[in-house]
């Protein structure tokens, strides 16, 4: 039940990311936003593999742990990118309106990465409980 809830949360926050991009229509998406989107994609792939491997929990213990570690590593990488993105926005963006738009979008992207990381934690707790 907890896994289904967190997966639903991941989908919701990724959907909100797209909605904010469409709603705010920023003049451009910066390099850091693209890097965060790439991390979200990679994190979702790791979650997909981990959820698939939950079906054979006893046989895939090592692979599951590896996926959970990779999800955590991606989240840590995203933290650095997020900090750089926010600093760059305040340093380089001259339009207050664009700054607010990109700050909101970047924060939502970071939330998506954090939800994916939470999914990894739930998967790891299932692994500990049933392995």
Where in this protein do the model-derived segments appear?
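Cytosolic, long alpha-helical scaffolding segments
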Residues: 1-131
